Amino acid sequence: MLYSLAQKFMFQMDAEQAHDLAIKSLKFTANSPLACGYSQALQSSPVNCMGITFPNPVGLAAGLDKDGEAIDAFHAMGFGFVEVGTVTPKPQAGNDKPRLFRLTKAKAIINRMGFNNKGVDNLVRNLQAKKTDILVGVNIGKNKDTPVEQGKDDYLICMDKVYPYAAYITVNISSPNTPGLRTMQYGALLDELLASIKAKQAELAEKYHRYVPVALKIAPDLTADEIESIAMSLISNQFDAVIATNTTLSRDGVEGMTHGTEMGGLSGAPLTAASTMVIKQLASFLNKKIPIIGVGGINSAQDALDKFDAGANLVQIYSGFIYQGPKIIKEIVNAVKMK
């Protein structure tokens, strides 16, 4: 009830202004009596993935809390884990505004944010300041002005800094809003990046006496051959997980709608089937050698169950959370318990 009132108010505002207000409000109310407005108790539904025991299989996808400002509030809502970021070595403003658009009729969002964030050092301070023990994954990317050929250096810089505080680290090479980034999903560039990440992981594991898993986040706009190639690279480089999928460049399901032709990545309900298909194909190629975190168009408990049936070990939500509110977390956890 409270969320539906807040949503009604927020949906009258510009999408990015509403997002920023929500994060500020959650940051202010977290760990205070005001958190009772959105906190909820969930049944325990532990899942072991990447060598980590998650209290439940429902996580917050990267992009909502880029700078890790409201982590404790999301813990109160019942998320099993939170993924912050995408964060880059240097702060960057991102693309010009407006750059975030609701397509309410389709329960969808288009964004062309462009990795706007306050930089990795700021994120580390926020990770140090969190008061709860919620598991936090950190999604890392490259700065816009870093050439693709040197992109791996940005990932290694971020990895170095977040490693002591992250439950796992996600390498994001699949945002459509950083020029050239998706070219890193293929061939020699991908293998070079994955090998560099694994070498850095080994170095940091020895330094901190702690193994932090690494995951790769991929796009939905891939052919079966490209998915197979990525799967083989993940296996050969012994990556710990893959996150499928990021936003899509397709506009199927939003044709003719207001904002439907805006540039950027489309998320939400129109992505549901495509994302689930990528998970299914990945699962067949990976043959349970590497776990899959499913994300993309989860707007109901059934959507989440479909992701699990396709081969996902965990799921993440973002657009569905915006449209449904915290109740969707409980609905998914309860549905998983009943399976």
UniProtKB/Swiss-Prot annotation:
FMN binds at A62, G63, L64, D65, K66, T86, N139, N172, K217, T245, G268, G297, Y318, S319. It is a peripheral membrane protein. Pathway: Pyrimidine metabolism; UMP biosynthesis via de novo pathway; orotate from (S)-dihydroorotate (quinone route): step 1/1. It catalyses: (S)-dihydroorotate + a quinone = orotate + a quinol. Substrate binds at K66, N111, R112, M113, G114, F115, N172, N177, N246, T247. Pfam families: DHO_dh. One of its GO terms (cellular component) is plasma membrane. It is found in: Cell membrane. GO terms for molecular function: dihydroorotate dehydrogenase (quinone) activity. It is an enzyme of class 1 (oxidoreductase). GO terms for biological process: 'de novo' pyrimidine nucleobase biosynthetic process; 'de novo' UMP biosynthetic process. InterPro entries: Aldolase_TIM (IPR013785), DHO_dehydrogenase (IPR050074), Dihydroorotate_DH_1_2 (IPR012135), Dihydroorotate_DH_2 (IPR005719), Dihydroorotate_DH_cat (IPR005720), Dihydroorotate_DH_CS (IPR001295). Gene3D superfamilies: Aldolase class I (3.20.20.70). Its EC number is 1.3.5.2. Keywords: Cell membrane, Flavoprotein, FMN, Membrane, Oxidoreductase, Pyrimidine biosynthesis. Its cofactor is FMN. Its main location: membrane. Binds 1 FMN per subunit. The active site is at S175 (nucleophile). Belongs to the dihydroorotate dehydrogenase family. Type 2 subfamily. Catalyzes the conversion of dihydroorotate to orotate with quinone as electron acceptor. Monomer. This is Dihydroorotate dehydrogenase (quinone).
